[in-house]
Amino acid sequence: MIRHRSDSVLLGPLASVRKPVSQPVIAAVRFMQVELPLHVRLIPQEIESAMRNAGIHADSLLEVRRMYNAVGIDVSKGKSTIAVLQPGGTVIRKPFDVSHTSQNLNELADYLGSLEGSTKIVMECTGRYHEPMLKALYEAGLFVSVVNPHLIKNFGNNSLRKVKSDPADARRIARYTLDNWAELRQYSGMDNTRTQLKTLNSQFSFFMKQKVAAKANLIALLDNTYPGVNKLFDSPPREDGSEKWVDYAYSFWHVDCVRRIGLKTFTERYKAFCKKHHYIFQQDKPEKLFNASKELVAVFPKEKTYKLLIQQSIRQLNLASEHVERLRQEMNALASTLPEYSTVMGIYGVGKTYGPQLIAEIGDVSRFTHREALTAFAGVDPGVDESGQHKSKSNRASKVGSARLRKTLFQIMTTLLQNAPEDDPVYRFLDKKRAQGKPYYVYMTAGANKFLRIYYGKVKECLRNLEQAE
């Protein structure tokens, strides 16, 4: 039995050893679990000496080490390949495939749950393909950890022969599990909320691209029937994403719809348009629009074909805008349930759009051990170029990580440059680098790096305070 509860959490299967475990052995096992990879076969002489002094044979510790089951899962669409290893490279079961059906996933969960000793399961975060497997194993009460595929890709490349197959990848993930046993982070219910938020952000990005493309297409069409109509109004978009100039172009899609009917008739129709769409009617606006239309040159004639094309494009744009605004609201509502929401929203330059996007792409900050880990995750950290006497003083950003996160960071940097808040440290840093003549991408990337460091510190402190309060 183990005398200290804090040690029982660390030592795990050592509780099965009948003879009381002394402090030297606890220290020895702690050294093996934290300092040494679990797949190392031999026990160092220092540990053997500590065990002899404690009166425990080395076979006891070897038996304990065999009670660690590392499960590596290589996920693909519709099926996964599973490998189960123990320390020392012991193969519990050769890699096998499991299809993503309810029955097969439940059978897999039962099998993994029946393994003796401590079992940890690791899989890569592969888009959406891993979610059925993750859901089944998490609901079965098993220890599941989802890791960045980049970590697995660069792990264990110590062979001249490059093998790329599902069984080989599953074994590699299992070896990664053994080497990082103590540092693995268990998937939790809060991760489910973050997964939903990241999925919403992915859809938000998709529909935003559609909206931008639809708007560009509409403006290109209108330039041939009503040039410059998109610049006639400066009203901001509504909560549903609709814009006044778009609604106006639907009713008055051609310049002849304005100038051919006379000022009086156009004024009446414009007034009816404002009433229908709940816009404020301005007395002088119809005359300005009418006079401006006289000087415009329409390339396309006023025919039904062009009217159909323009109005269909407007419907498509309004639909995409509606999706974008709906997703924006859902993201903000979901992000507000996370503990760091108020802290993130309090950072200058972060609003109801960028805040949820940051939280979605960064995820749980507690999984990053230091600030540099977060900047490396975002790909805004400077690379290292040193060899022998050569030490480069200026290196390119790594750009490894979430491209959507880097895009959001650059948008925040743009907001800071536009608003120029003198009391904001990130803006002062940006302005300093810009004044030094640094290229655009250099000072924007450096500003994003500094912003993430501040983000990390504030959110980390927020989570720490919440833990202490509990």
PLM region spans:
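N-terminal compositionally biased or targeting/leader segments
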Residues: 9-12, 79
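Short, low-complexity, intrinsically disordered N-terminal modules
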Residues: 2, 13-18, 28-30
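Intrinsic-disorder-associated, low-complexity terminal segments enriched in Asp/Asn/His/Tyr and depleted
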Residues: 4-7
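A detector of single, family-specific signature residues
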Residues: 22-470
